[in-house]
Amino acid sequence: MEENYKATSRNGHELKDMYNPETNTLDIRSNGLYPSNVLSNLCSNGFRFDGMICESMEGFLQSLKRKELDKQRQICSMKGGNARKMSVTSWQTDQIVWWKGQAIDRQSEEYQQLIRSAYLAMFEQSERFRTALMQTRGMFLTHNSGESDTY
């Protein structure tokens, strides 16, 4: 059954309004009101990328931390919250991630292009993601969660 992404609460918790009208900024958060929640990597905006079925952007991103193709496929097929639980930190020391057996420098243009291509695939294939993104036209989009250290 499809979750109601325009709801104001989920699992007994109120979703938060992540829009700041003073700065015209929307903070993308899974616990935010629509469209913030649908733009989150944790949202189940399924797409197919490079022959892999990805149930969420989080699944794709977490899969990059694993060298083994079978493990990547498994993580790609997970929805956001479950995929996030598969996170590992071993890649951080040498800043190498993996895609389909190929090592990629996390700080490289090749990595940036891979991420752009995955987001483009999700945009093209997920009407819900596209519609939510179009709702933010003219807004500044941020993600003020996580670590500030890019390494």
Regions found by a protein language model. Give the residues of each.
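Charged, low-complexity intrinsically disordered segments
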Residues: 1-151
